[in-house]
Amino acid sequence: MEMAKEQELILVLDFGSQYNQLITRRIREMGVYSELHDHEISMEEIKRLNPKGIILSGGPNSVYEEDSFTIDPEIYNLGVPILGICYGMQLTTKLLGGKVERANEREYGKAIINAKTDELFFGLPEEQNVWMSHSDKVIEIPEGFEVIADSPSTNYAAIEDKSRRIYGVQFHPEVRHTEYGNDLLRNFVRRVCDCIGEWSMENFIEIEIEKIRNQVGDRKVLCAMSGGVDSSVVAVLLHKAIGDQLTCIFVDHGLLRKGEGDMVMEQFGEGFNMNIIRVDAQERFMSKLQGVSDPEQKRKIIGNEFIYVFDDEASKLKGVDFLAQGTLYTDVIESGTKTAQTIKSHHNVGGLPEDMEFQLIEPINTLFKDEVRELGIELGIPEHLVWRQPFPGPGLGIRVLGEITEDKLEIVRESDAILRQVIREEGLEREIWQYFTVLPGIQSVGVMGDYRTYDHTVGIRAVTSIDGMTSDFARIDWEVLQKISSRIVNEVDHVNRVVYDITSKPPSTIEWE
């Protein structure tokens, strides 16, 4: 993201840790903007970004392995404060002349450190519980460094070169298990990097509107509306920035929730006075998806067809150069980087055709889900719209496992409507992060009345989360679940069983496909 000159930035460099996004989250929660970049970022790009501080993340590699991730040692001469976490500390040690070796035993879990009072541990107790996750250890620190924390298992739990403002910690301050982790990160961000902490959604809107106007000029933009919160927020942000230069295309692909299409047209077309074209492409999508059961293939087909529909609609308009999408930061992260395996391709990331004729605008691709909701409120979108259930671009296409048919879509559509209605009636909308039904493609024997049935099973997925990167299954009252189950079985044709998904993320993702 292009940052305004006055915008404070903490740059997090990615070495493959599963906790990378948590570092970024923790810093943003302090009111300071933070971005995650690949460790191969050039010195020129770092200088252009002009960060107030740099954090080197943890990672699964060993620094002494031949193909281990590394950085340009010139980074330590930029005069910018640096904090190395776990692998980041070991890499700093190696590059600056210290020594690292494999530990006798891998240290994973809670540990106790003894810390000295310095800038990093300012105001914190000497003895602290921290979270360790490493199999290597520092055995000799570089010249100019001193120890600022130790533990029973290592003499070098934390180190510093005070004159150059370079720090390293062997533990993970970004995870909740580290007792004073947030305080340590805050000390680095506020005391060492001298950040004021003025980043807010109001500030983000000002910066993003200026960026959009500079990028677009007097040209036109198409916005892909899916009916979900993300694309809706993007549409309103763009409309605020460029007004009538924006045309929203709402593709009714037949994979929408019950009543979704009419709601979008009413709330945004009429409510926000936006130019929205509703395209009926149901037959087109169903034709392409016929016989397809692989989830990745379904996602890519849906992504491709979205773009081709836009191409068709854009050809009817003049001077359209840009396509706007509601891609989130979590979408980008989950689609994989050089240091992380792809979990699943995202419909806004992995499904784009190579011959796409539009330039992309993705104004919220640096925001997490809760930040997008905050942005929506700041933009004046009513709360009942901002707090609608997250809905993926592929829609119900990834909530029908296996091949998609009209009958299966109807089961998911009707069962999902019942689930949402009961959750709303029980006042649980704000307590549960996301909830929906899924058709797993399982049929089982049942008895309804005096007759044997062999019908579909509907799965209920309901999770609690803050940012969508991790989640836990929602502890919904059994009586509420029984009410939902009873209504689905009695009101939705060809369903004789309802199950509840009690898996967390990880190991599962929130969506089933």
UniProtKB/Swiss-Prot annotation:
GO terms for cellular component: cytosol. Residues 199-388 form the GMPS ATP-PPase domain. Its EC number is 6.3.5.2. It comes from the Bacteria. The active site is at C86 (nucleophile), H172, E174. GO terms for molecular function: ATP binding; GMP synthase activity. Residues 9-198 form the Glutamine amidotransferase type-1 domain. Pathway: Purine metabolism; GMP biosynthesis; GMP from XMP (L-Gln route): step 1/1. Catalyzes the synthesis of GMP from XMP. HAMAP family: GMP_synthase (MF_00344). Homodimer. This is GMP synthase [glutamine-hydrolyzing]. It comes from Staphylococcus saprophyticus subsp. saprophyticus (strain ATCC 15305 / DSM 20229 / NCIMB 8711 / NCTC 7292 / S-41).
